[in-house]
């Protein structure tokens, strides 16, 4: 086994086998793992928010689904991965908070993160 590389919140990284990537504490965040089985290049992003255009402080591309997934893909392609072989797995997107104890009025950042991530993967042609 190679090195275990930690990916923090609003962060992303890539590696090649035998190294591995890990993240913890997803909650409403999304963990997006990309993998090219031929070159064994992997990528992992810990996405916090769905849309970089919704807030002013958006310089950290890894924080957002719309920019983080794109940046992760670019890094993997530079490392030798092929876009047509890359497969994606998504984890996280929990509904974390309810306002005034009313579950129907929950802040739904998790669902928004999931939908934005799926949309970006479709736009990029990643399955």
Model-derived regions, located:
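Conserved mixed alpha/beta catalytic, RNA-binding, or beta-rich assembly cores of soluble enzyme
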Residues: 22-79
């Amino acid at each position: 086994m190679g090195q275990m590389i930690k990916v923090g919140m609003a962060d992303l990284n890539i590696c090649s086998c035998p190294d591995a990537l890990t993240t913890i504490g997803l909650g409403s965040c999304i963990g997006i793992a990309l993998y090219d089985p031929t070159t064994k290049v992997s990528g992992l992003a810990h996405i916090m928010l769905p849309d970089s255009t919704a807030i002013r402080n958006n310089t950290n591309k890894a924080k957002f689904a719309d920019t983080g997934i794109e940046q992760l893909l670019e890094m993997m392609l530079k490392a030798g991965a092929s876009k047509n072989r890359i497969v994606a797995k998504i984890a996280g997107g929990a509904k974390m908070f309810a306002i005034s104890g009313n579950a129907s009025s929950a802040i739904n950042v998790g669902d928004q993160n999931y939908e934005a991530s799926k949309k970006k993967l479709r736009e990029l042609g990643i399955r």
